[in-house]
């Protein structure tokens, strides 16, 4: 599976390692950073757990986790 990741700068699409078959998007509201919302994108074997102030979305299609300000594709 190919997922968008914030582990690189700029954000790019990477092929996930074996065993990591999910893409995720984790967004944290302003409580996490003085700069506003924090967005984390990447690959995962299981959907990351969510804290009360976070929104976590997981999916299993290529590039299904775009940055909220990025157009899909």
Swiss-Prot record:
Swiss-Prot/TrEMBL keywords: Acetylcholine receptor inhibiting toxin, Disulfide bond, Ion channel impairing toxin, Neurotoxin, Postsynaptic neurotoxin, Secreted, Toxin
Pfam families tied to this protein: Toxin_cobra-type
InterPro entries referenced in this protein's UniProt entry, alphabetically: Snake_3FTx, Snake_toxin-like_sf, Snake_toxin_con_site, Toxin_cobra-type
Tissue specificity statement from the Swiss-Prot or TrEMBL entry: Expressed by the venom gland.
SUPFAM superfamilies on file: Snake toxin-like
Gene Ontology terms, MF aspect: acetylcholine receptor inhibitor activity; ion channel regulator activity; toxin activity
Similarity comment: Belongs to the three-finger toxin family. Long-chain subfamily. Type II alpha-neurotoxin sub-subfamily.
Entry function: Binds with high affinity to muscular (alpha-1/CHRNA1) and neuronal (alpha-7/CHRNA7) nicotinic acetylcholine receptor (nAChR) and inhibits acetylcholine from binding to the receptor, thereby impairing neuromuscular and neuronal transmission. Mice injected with this toxin develop flaccid paralysis followed by death. Irreversibly inhibits twitches in a concentration-dependent manner in rat phrenic nerve-hemidiaphragm and chick biventer cervicis muscle.
Protein name per its UniProtKB record: Alpha-bungarotoxin N3
């Amino acid at each position: 599976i190919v997922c968008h990741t914030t582990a690189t700068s700029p954000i790019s699409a990477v092929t996930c390692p074996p065993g990591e078959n999910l893409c995720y998007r984790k967004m944290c509201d302003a409580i996490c950073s003085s700069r506003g919302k924090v967005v984390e994108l990447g690959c995962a074997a299981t959907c990351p757990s969510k804290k009360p102030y976070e929104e976590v979305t997981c999916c299993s299609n290529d590039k299904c986790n775009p940055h909220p300000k990025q157009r899909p594709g």
